[in-house]
């Protein structure tokens, strides 16, 4: 999951054709009327140009409309109009992802404003199990059949409350709630059944497998542990739960043909990248298809520009031409060694570390001639946990006198990846950079002996 780093979320719905951010479940199926057959391959091609590793297709949002011909409800593409009748987004999305060698998964909303079973009570006022048994769990099982190579199934936490829906009616709306989503949706059974079908899938929103970072604005905490909750996580939490940050590339989650969709610029998206991927989180960026079932040109242009920025600013690793040393290194054992040169060998399965009990160390990278540097990236060997608590980065023009870099960036955690802008800003690119004949990375505190598998310099 964490090795994916960046992915995309694609939302096309019946609400795309009503210009509403959320539907109500009262929309007629014929409202879903794409002007041509939606093209998931184009969605993923746009994402790939921005160096994204995969995507999650929203195949059922809160309005309950299913973007595949499900057997669980008539509120699906089978009863839509025009090109919509031929739509099977899970199939086309999975096929396209495999062709493009990308990861794929599906978002399915447990809340269903179209189902008469959702929130239904019996004559004694108790919630029935009909929705979970007849609709929700079978829908998830259907989606699992689209491929055992799915990497994530995403379950939104929004549920009931003050938002009114049809719940089986096209003409009148009502408000419904449920008391406990874990029991109502039969989550333990859901987790077990889906993992039996998809052993390698990560399930978001139904347990502790991966966590929401706590906002929808594309940033995580500068301190970010892969355990615990929210933006920062917790060093002391007992279960691994990598942070996932969902964000929008436009004003809303869905395309609105009547509004300025306020497409975010590549520079804004690059800042998001630094504040998520560069802070030990994964970035899930929403790309809403338009009424033609395509990612709009205005979005595609900025995504391609983001890819260009990533190539230009983080594409040439200067560390590969450096000499790297450490003042403290664990002795080789068996066929393995833990030498500092492992940090620049390009192999994510080798790493540098210190002897047991050594929680501090100094690593230096040196060049024969000064280099122009702007970013330093560190990556822990997280197969053995996340350990580093505090570090600092310094540069030297002459290899003798060093100056601390990174501004007010909190150089605390590293995790899978930490990118430090040496000028201290994620928003402002350092045009001039800093001349450096040497870079010093001092690990000042670690939970146990620190382990790093890669250092990159850009």
Regions found by a protein language model. Give the residues of each.
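Single conserved hydrophobic/aromatic residue that forms the stacking wall/gate
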Residues: 1-7, 12
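The substrate-binding groove and active-site-proximal loops of carbohydrate-active enzymes
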Residues: 23-40, 69-88, 121-134, 154-164, ...
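Catalytic domains of carbohydrate-active enzymes, especially glycoside hydrolases
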Residues: 38-62
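Carbohydrate-binding surfaces of carbohydrate-active enzymes
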Residues: 46, 80-81, 87, 93-106, ...
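An active-site-proximal structural segment forming one wall of the substrate-binding cleft
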Residues: 46-48, 82-100, 127-150
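Aromatic-lined carbohydrate-binding surfaces of glycoside hydrolases
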Residues: 59-73, 85, 106-120
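Substrate-binding cleft/loops of secretory-pathway carbohydrate-active enzymes
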Residues: 114-127, 146-149, 154, 158-249, ...
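Aromatic, loop-rich ligand-recognition surfaces of beta-strand-rich domains
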Residues: 298, 310-313, 345-409, 423-458
